[in-house]
Amino acid sequence: MASDLTPHAGMAGRATVPGYDPKKHDPFFDGVSDALADKGFVVAAADDLVTWARTGSLMWMTFGLACCAVEMMQASMPRYDVERFGFAPRASPRQSDVMIVAGTLTNKMAPALRKVYDQMPEPRYVISMGSCANGGGYYHYSYSVVRGCDRIVPVDIYVPGCPPTAEALVYGILQLQKKIRREGSIER
């Protein structure tokens, strides 16, 4: 018999977290499943449907500025595989919902960060990853460092650490999805 981590036909080559079942962690999905089993069709508010779809299909754009970007890349690798949460990378800001600012933001780079943020479609979200992006970090007193990317763009989730682990970034992504579900409106 295969263990929880042994790949089998249903896994399509992906590693899973033992004991994690996405169906158990999404109350909207539970309601949809119950309604389908009971009546054969679902009646739901369009706002709830859009919010549910939005949390399961977030496209992220990297803004890797320093060593935190290495941990951000690791979160996309097979061990953590953030795409299983519907969090897929995109290279263009016009196709992205989330920007991950990872690393030290300098005064010279700040206008480029704002320009890329302005090119993202609404609703857009920002994850600040690492001590340098959160508040300047080790280089806080340098003349050329912005003391937190929240001075340039509005930040939704802060991921602490120097550098934060890939697990911390995955937790931040899950918190962003929870925040989007809590807001629950089409307009942000």
From Swiss-Prot:
Which Gene Ontology MF annotations are present?
4 iron, 4 sulfur cluster binding; iron ion binding; NADH dehydrogenase (ubiquinone) activity; NADH:ubiquinone reductase (non-electrogenic) activity; quinone binding
Question: Where does it sit, as one GO cellular component term?
Answer: plasma membrane
An individual GO BP term: aerobic respiration
Tell me how this protein sits in the membrane.
Peripheral membrane protein
**Positions of [4Fe-4S] cluster binding:** C67, C68, C132, C162
**InterPro entries linked to this entry:** NADH_UbQ_OxRdtase-like_20kDa, NADH_UQ_OxRdtase_20Kd_su
PROSITE patterns, from UniProt?
COMPLEX1_20K
Q: Which UniProt keywords apply?
A: 4Fe-4S, Cell inner membrane, Cell membrane, Iron, Iron-sulfur, Membrane, Metal-binding, NAD, Quinone, Translocase, Transport, Ubiquinone
E.C. designation(s):
7.1.1.-
Q: Which family does it belong to?
A: Belongs to the complex I 20 kDa subunit family.
State what this protein does: NDH-1 shuttles electrons from NADH, via FMN and iron-sulfur (Fe-S) centers, to quinones in the respiratory chain. Couples the redox reaction to proton translocation (for every two electrons transferred, four hydrogen ions are translocated across the cytoplasmic membrane), and thus conserves the redox energy in a proton gradient.
Designated name of the protein? NADH-quinone oxidoreductase subunit B
Q: Which organism is it from?
A: Maricaulis maris (strain MCS10) (Caulobacter maris)
Q: Which gene encodes it?
A: nuoB
